[in-house]
Amino acid sequence: MLMPLCGLLWWWWCCCSGWYCYGLCAPAPQMLRHQGLLKCRCRMLFNDLKVFLLRRPPQAPLPMHGDPQPPGLAANNTLPALGAGGWAGWRGPREVVGREPPPVPPPPPLPPSSVEDDWGGPATEPPASLLSSASSDDFCKEKTEDRYSLGSSLDSGMRTPLCRICFQGPEQGELLSPCRCDGSVKCTHQPCLIKWISERGCWSCELCYYKYHVIAISTKNPLQWQAISLTVIEKVQVAAAILGSLFLIASISWLIWSTFSPSARWQRQDLLFQICYGMYGFMDVVCIGLIIHEGPSVYRIFKRWQAVNQQWKVLNYDKTKDLEDQKAGGRTNPRTSSSTQANIPSSEEETAGTPAPEQGPAQAAGHPSGPLSHHHCAYTILHILSHLRPHEQRSPPGSSRELVMRVTTV
């Protein structure tokens, strides 16, 4: 019995001595530092648990817009402002809601004695609910001012006339009304119209076919001349017209010299030169046809170049002058009445009520119906002049929408 007991005591003594020696060999400062860190962390953990579990829950702030606050949002709002600490900049989740509260007067400030924090001392800053309500009121006022300014700008933009080419207002320059068009395509800037004429090569409106009243002031300095953009087809047309003109001049000059010169008498008697005369005559006819065919295109290109390299002044549309010009044109062309009678049928109702367009400008002017007859006469003369207008490509009746889009997209 004594031997096992002695062995057990011997084993216990050896273990104690071994642990003691290990404690002597281990670095004491490092072990003490680890123990101190562990104690500090445990103490901080217990303090945090005491703060979050043993404190009383704060009262939920009343909503400013009068609607009951959702339970999820009220459950999240559990951290009040803690004076000048790290929680003073925290805002409740009520500000994140998508709805904007209506502007209401801010609540009266609380007395200093009633504003206390959870630890019994006076708070140094107002609660988070007051700060959030003030910020929401400022945000609502700013939104209201922005909406008012946007509405006023839209209203003023709808009343302000715009250029039908660049879609800018009078701040970019003086707006003119150079043709009969009305509505949103009535006004345009003078530089925009000159640039449009230089790109299109036509000096009349493509909607109402009214020829712009443009006065040439002066030509620019040759050092300031600008080149216009040409397509491949336009370049070929210009080259063909120039080469055809040069060949025609040279050929006609040689034919005239060989026909009337005494020194070329032997050429006129030679068979080979007689064949050349026939070939040159045929080539001259071809060149004349080429020049006639490409002449209008080259003339439009020249007018485009002239619009860019000359200073112009565009006049506004004068309705009275336009009507006078149409009446004068109707008097100088009396044969237009017969052509309109063949193209436009008349009816008994038009004859009884208003003068028909085919009755001629003299009868329309003497009819007692007044301004209506003048309008009929004006539109009839305009229609006739548009048919008699030379070297102008007429668009089909269904292409008016395309023309409007071309005007508005430049």
UniProtKB/Swiss-Prot annotation:
It comes from the Eukaryota. It is found in: Golgi apparatus membrane. The keyword Metal-binding applies. It catalyses: S-ubiquitinyl-[E2 ubiquitin-conjugating enzyme]-L-cysteine + [acceptor protein]-L-lysine = [E2 ubiquitin-conjugating enzyme]-L-cysteine + N(6)-ubiquitinyl-[acceptor protein]-L-lysine. Residues 126-136, 352-366 have a biased composition (Low complexity). Zn(2+) 2 binds at C179, C181, C205, C208. Expressed in brain and placenta. It is a multi-pass membrane protein. Residues 100-112 have a biased composition (Pro residues). Residues 92-136, 324-372, 390-410 are annotated as: Disordered. A zinc finger (RING-CH-type) spans 155-215. The keyword Zinc-finger applies. The chain crosses the membrane at residues 238-258, 272-292. GO terms for cellular component: Golgi membrane; Golgi stack; trans-Golgi network. Residues 1-18 form the signal peptide. GO terms for molecular function: ubiquitin-protein transferase activity; zinc ion binding. Pathway: Protein modification; protein ubiquitination. Keywords: Golgi apparatus, Membrane, Metal-binding, Signal, Transferase, Transmembrane, Transmembrane helix, Ubl conjugation pathway, Zinc, Zinc-finger. One of its GO terms (biological process) is protein ubiquitination. InterPro entries: MARCHF4/9/11 (IPR046356), MARCHF4_RING_CH-C4HC3 (IPR047905), Znf_RING-CH (IPR011016), Znf_RING/FYVE/PHD (IPR013083). PROSITE patterns: ZF_RING_CH. Its EC number is 2.3.2.27. SMART domains: RINGv (SM00744). E3 ubiquitin-protein ligase that may mediate ubiquitination of MHC-I and CD4, and promote their subsequent endocytosis and sorting to lysosomes via multivesicular bodies. E3 ubiquitin ligases accept ubiquitin from an E2 ubiquitin-conjugating enzyme in the form of a thioester and then directly transfer the ubiquitin to targeted substrates. The RING-CH-type zinc finger domain is required for E3 ligase activity. This is E3 ubiquitin-protein ligase MARCHF4. It comes from Homo sapiens.
